[in-house]
Amino acid sequence: MISLNLSPSLNPGLLHKTRTCQQPTRLSALLVTNPKPFNHRHPLGLSPIPNLQIRDVSAKPLLSLTNPESSSGFSRKPRSIAAVGSSDSNPDEKSDLGEAEKKEKKAKTLQLGIVFGLWYFQNIVFNIFNKKALNVFPYPWLLASFQLFAGSIWMLVLWSFKLYPCPKISKPFIIALLGPALFHTIGHISACVSFSKVAVSFTHVIKSAEPVFSVIFSSLLGDSYPLAVWLSILPIVMGCSLAAVTEVSFNLGGLSGAMISNVGFVLRNIYSKRSLQSFKEIDGLNLYGCISILSLLYLFPVAIFVEGSHWVPGYHKAIASVGTPSTFYFWVLLSGVFYHLYNQSSYQALDEISPLTFSVGNTMKRVVVIISTVLVFRNPVRPLNALGSAIAIFGTFLYSQATAKKKKIEVGGDKKN
């Protein structure tokens, strides 16, 4: 075995002595170039020979050129081919890169527009046909159960035909999901009860107060919020109060249903963050599908107990009111399918965009839904009622901005730590 120690101050004579002191080796076992005068570009005195390999017949490397930092005490990082190419690139290549970036931005903008467009459209369709069905069949427990049933069937079809990856279901996951599914059930049925009692626009105005409950419950559980978040909920409270006082179709049951729905969905979100931390591999759509199935198991037995005896006579009244059974079936079917679709789109939108963009989009969604339902059902709106609704929705926008800044600060602090 021949051992060589190369450094910038290598003495060729020392190399000769080292070789003569060792056992004789064959000429093919060693390849060394003749020493040359000191060259500033190559301080080892070696010319740069591409792919020069120095090997011994014994299969062990005779000479290994490693990182200079570990052998000679200095660092010399070679310029990569990509770096050389980029420095000498012509303006045409730079313009091509700029065009590619512009096309990518346009594609993302188009994709974002499609996601938001589908989300808004599906939400509008659900709210319109859900209200149409409830106007002739005022039994929200059955209708809410059917909507969960439609979503459950939809997800089972996707999983069965491998149109969407099926999540790995385990006993710990089901146990962790029991709480969020229960609160989701409470939020969904309460909203349906509210829709059956009052105008859709009024329910959505009251549901815009969800951030108020989120801040209160999260604070009780130990979370802290900056002053800007607390100030942002003031216009929400004021706007909802003004809208409730001036609402033409005011009903205490409708108001209570919307408020309970806020509590249910807030507790669902809080409980999900705490109980599902160990199941982050399950994406939002699969999580919502599992919640829908469990919520159906929660809701339908209670629905039979609450209003099951009224379903048959209520059905006959609904058919008599509409005129044809197919029209009534069409309304109910659309309410169920589009209830799932708009929730599916919301989860997909959340995967594609930032939480801030999502919250702003969700705020604007309420505006679009309120205006659409007012136009479709021709609900009378007083000026003060419209003002209160606008103040409440503006408050939700301020809340989304304030919470987004809070999350940015938290993420920045985590990176520094």
UniProtKB/Swiss-Prot annotation:
**Molecular function GO labels:** phosphoglycerate transmembrane transporter activity; triose-phosphate transmembrane transporter activity
Q: Does the keyword Acyltransferase apply?
A: no
- The modified positions for N-acetylalanine read A83
Every EamA domain range: 127-243
Q: Name one Pfam family in it.
A: TPT
Question: Region labeled Disordered — which residues?
Answer: 66-102
Q: Which domain of life is it from?
A: Eukaryota
User: Start and end of the transit peptide?
Assistant: 1-82
Gene Ontology, cellular component aspect: chloroplast envelope; chloroplast membrane; plastid
Q: Basic and acidic residues bias: where?
A: 91-102
Q: How does it sit in the membrane?
A: Multi-pass membrane protein
Q: Does the keyword Transmembrane apply?
A: yes
Cited function = Sugar phosphate/phosphate translocator that transports inorganic phosphate, triose phosphate, 3-phosphoglycerate, xylulose 5-phosphate (Xul-5-P) and to a lesser extent ribulose 5-phosphate. Does not transport ribose 5-phosphate or hexose phosphates. Provides cytosolic Xul-5-P to the chloroplast, where it is used as an intermediate in the plastidic pentose phosphate pathways.
Q: Which protein family is it in?
A: Belongs to the TPT transporter family. TPT (TC 2.A.7.9) subfamily.
What is this protein called in UniProt? Answer: Xylulose 5-phosphate/phosphate translocator, chloroplastic
